């Protein structure tokens, strides 16, 4: 008996929590940007594995963590879009380096 199984493919993002004494810094990036570096007009966006490559999470879990973060560092179209749609980051705070959106939220 054959069964039709439909799997919902959700986009995953890397989420890494850097704990300090006073605040938690959360780094979020699109999975396809890990390890890449972008430079434009003296600005450098280094999506290093050390800082960004934490646990791969779906949008729901990523959003839960974003909402609780003291400081956010977000890179990539999908990650920024998730934060923007949920009023975590304002469009005014988003910069683009080589077309890659980036925002910091304090």
Report the location of each language-model feature.
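Short active-site oxyanion
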Residues: 66-72
